[in-house]
């Protein structure tokens, strides 16, 4: 009798719908629906597997749940996905000498002097974030400038964009670099400043971080990202050491942010020969390979079709011949990887588009070839993206940071295809947004602000810079959620709060649809949730770490 009753109870339980774990109620929910329009909702039902069961609208009957969370009327957004960031660099930079915002060479020297005093010893001093465009002289620092402050141990300070570094004499000596050392193809050397490919001459001598140091840096990076509501990242230029740090975190159940990994060049494919499946409950996947076609605008390494307006003897740096770039990207594609190629100048973008057109003829248009930055483009080249199935992976805050410099570097005519977000949208080209952190802050909200206004957080310039390229808020949010998920082949798992997807979301302190662009850019995250679990909460009277 008891056995019969037990069997009946078991059958009834199996026939009943699963009892969901968590109900988020009383929320001002905003997301992008599949058609690209804003969808408003008031609650989420989250299953015990961490996935969305149901999106609730106003007036819907509240389902039962083990736990009910009152959102207090806060705005709830899908977790923001940064399509292009450098995760380990973010963590390491947060632990090293911070040079972001220095307004002169003298301020850089002062910060270096103070840091050296606080960190005595014989170890290398590493720092990052300087930008000579913010200095009155607008000239690169030199080895002599660093020697004047620290000469007894190696010092290496990386430019904000990661495309140049300055080394003191001790660092150059350790690397075996002399006045007669030639710059490699795709690089330049200027009195101790090493641009693009030339950076490798110094970097080869820098002691590699230990596994323990890498683990600390990765956890630091995750803390920063979660504080800004970033729940997923396209992890660009990932080394095998970086990958191993991610795996160690996953093995210890310390992998919180979802990572779509793009390996740095072909060398890692000797160890990871094909794309991996999703690991650690969809927290980690090696999906693509990252390549470079040129350098950066700030160091005049971006490869242009015509000379720089402020340096007529230079067109920038071409990293590869057409044949070389095709051979490398084809090797990655043949192994099943997606390709993501850095291209900033109009010549570099044209080369990458041509390369991808050839790959599409061979592999089809469904491989989602990515152009990273797609920053300065000949308007005639932009329509070529959609037929080849190319994704434009762009960073809105590059436009606000680069505006004055871009005008000086390019002149007015070449700006017609610069940071052309609305043109990309109108042509139906898949658009993904990110920040390129730590080049810019990983905070996505200044990016959303820039996208809808073409202004910085101070409202400059009045009326917006090339305002015809502004996006609607729905378009901008789509690029930071659904678009970034699509760019990483993750749209079935993240990018929206549709039923069946992971319940990754953020609660913020204001409704982004009801504030001006500058207030949108100052949005603060209150809580960050991943897989239906709260993983970050703002301490009272505290802001998330800056993390530039």
Language model regions located:
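Non-cysteine beta-strand/loop elements that form the S-adenosyl-L-methionine
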Residues: 283-301, 390-400
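Hydrophobic membrane-embedded alpha-helices
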Residues: 172, 186-189, 377, 384, ...
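Acidic (Asp/Glu)-rich catalytic clusters
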Residues: 250-252, 275-284, 364, 385-389
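Gram-negative bacterial Sec-dependent N-terminal signal peptides
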Residues: 1-19
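Divalent metal-binding segments
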Residues: 22-25, 31, 36-272, 291-348, ...
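His/Asp/Glu-enriched, well-ordered alpha-helical/loop segment
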Residues: 216, 329-340, 344-369, 373, ...
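Short proline/glycine-enriched turn/loop segments at secondary-structure junctions
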Residues: 277-278, 515-520
């Amino acid at each position: 009798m008891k056995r019969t009753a037990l069997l009946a109870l078991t059958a009834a339980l199996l026939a009943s719908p699963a009892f969901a774990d968590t109900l988020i109620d009383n929320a001002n929910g905003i997301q992008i629906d599949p058609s690209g329009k804003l969808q408003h909702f008031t609650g989420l039902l989250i299953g015990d597997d961490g996935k969305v069961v149901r999106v609730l609208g106003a007036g819907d009957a509240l389902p039962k749940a083990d736990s009910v969370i009152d959102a207090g009327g806060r705005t709830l957004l899908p977790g923001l996905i940064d399509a292009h960031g450098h995760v380990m660099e973010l963590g390491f930079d947060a632990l090293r000498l911070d040079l972001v915002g220095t307004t002169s060479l003298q301020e850089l020297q002062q910060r270096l002097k103070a840091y050296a005093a606080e960190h005595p010893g014989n170890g290398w001093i590493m720092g990052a974030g300087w930008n000579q465009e913010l200095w009155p002289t607008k000239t690169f620092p030199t080895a002599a400038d660093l020697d004047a402050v620290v000469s007894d141990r190696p010092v290496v300070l990386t430019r904000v964009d990661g495309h140049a570094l300055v080394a003191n004499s001790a660092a150059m000596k350790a690397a075996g670099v002399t006045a007669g050392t030639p710059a490699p193809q795709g690089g330049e050397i200027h009195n101790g400043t090493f641009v693009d490919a030339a950076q490798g001459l110094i970097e080869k001598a820098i002691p590699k971080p230990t596994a323990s140091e890498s683990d600390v840096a990765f956890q630091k990076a995750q803390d920063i990202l979660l504080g800004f509501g970033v729940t997923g990242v396209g992890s660009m230029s990932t080394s095998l050491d970086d990958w191993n740090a991610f795996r160690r975190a996953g093995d210890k159940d310390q992998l919180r942010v979802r990572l779509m990994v793009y390996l740095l060049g072909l060398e890692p494919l000797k160890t990871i020969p094909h794309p991996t499946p999703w690991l650690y409950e969809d927290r980690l996947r090696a999906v693509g390979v990252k390549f470079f076609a040129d350098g950066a605008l700030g160091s005049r390494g971006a490869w242009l079709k015509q000379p720089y307006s402020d340096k007529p003897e230079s067109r920038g740096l071409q990293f590869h011949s057409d044949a070389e770039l095709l051979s490398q990207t084809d090797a990655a594609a043949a192994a099943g990887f997606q390709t993501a190629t850095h291209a900033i100048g109009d010549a570099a973008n044209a080369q990458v588009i041509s390369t991808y057109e050839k790959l599409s003829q061979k592999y089809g248009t469904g491989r989602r070839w990515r152009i990273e930055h797609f920053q300065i483009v000949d308007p005639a080249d932009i329509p070529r993206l959609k037929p080849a199935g190319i994704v434009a992976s762009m960073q809105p805050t590059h436009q606000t940071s680069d505006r004055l410099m871009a005008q000086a570097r390019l002149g007015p005519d070449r700006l017609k295809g610069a940071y052309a977000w609305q043109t990309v949208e109108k042509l139906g080209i898949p658009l993904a947004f990110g920040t390129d952190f730590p080049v810019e802050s990983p905070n996505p909200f200044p990016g959303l602000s820039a996208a809808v206004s073409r202004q910085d957080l101070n409202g400059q310039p009045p009326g917006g810079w090339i305002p015809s390229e502004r996006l609607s808020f729905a378009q901008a949010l789509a690029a930071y959620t659904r678009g970034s998920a699509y760019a990483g082949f993750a749209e079935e798992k993240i990018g929206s709060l549709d039923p069946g997807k992971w319940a990754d979301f953020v609660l913020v302190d204001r409704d982004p649809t009801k504030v001006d662009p500058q207030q949108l850019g100052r949005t603060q995250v209150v809580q960050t949730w991943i897989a239906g679990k709260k993983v970050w909460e703002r301490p009272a009277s505290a802001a998330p770490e800056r993390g530039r």
